[in-house]
C-alpha cells in the first residue's frame, strides 16, 4: 500500500544553524537506504516550509511512522511528522 507523508523541520525550536551539512548528509544516507529497500518511492522538498513530502510503500501506517522515526532529524527531535495519508488507486484510469 502507498502512503504520502508530510514533515517539517522544527527550525523555530532549534534554529537554522542546528541543521548542519553533516546532519543533512546523515539524513540523506538514511533516505537512500530506505529507497534501496523499496520503502521510500519518491521524496520532494516542500515548497511552503522546510521539510519533505515522501511517497512510501508499506504494509500500514505504523510501518511508515517507524521508517520516519528512523530518520536522524526525527531522532534528535528536529523533525515533526505533520501527516501520514493512505493512498488508493484513482479509478478514473481503470479499464472499463
Give the positions of each predicted feature:
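Conserved, structured core segments of small domains
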Residues: 1-96
Amino acid at each position: 500500500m502507498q502512503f504520502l507523508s508530510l514533515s517539517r523541520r522544527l527550525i523555530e525550536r532549534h534554529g537554522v544553524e542546528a541543521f548542519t551539512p553533516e546532519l543533512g548528509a546523515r539524513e540523506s544516507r538514511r533516505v537512500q537506504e530506505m529507497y534501496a529497500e523499496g520503502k521510500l518511492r519518491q521524496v520532494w522538498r516542500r515548497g511552503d516550509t522546510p521539510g519533505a513530502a515522501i511517497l512510501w510503500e508499506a504494509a500500514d501506517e505504523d510501518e511508515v511512522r517507524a521508517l520516519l522515526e528512523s530518520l536522524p532529524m526525527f531522532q534528535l527531535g528536529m523533525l515533526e511528522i505533520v501527516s501520514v495519508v493512505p493512498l488508493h488507486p484513482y479509478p478514473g484510469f481503470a479499464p472499463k
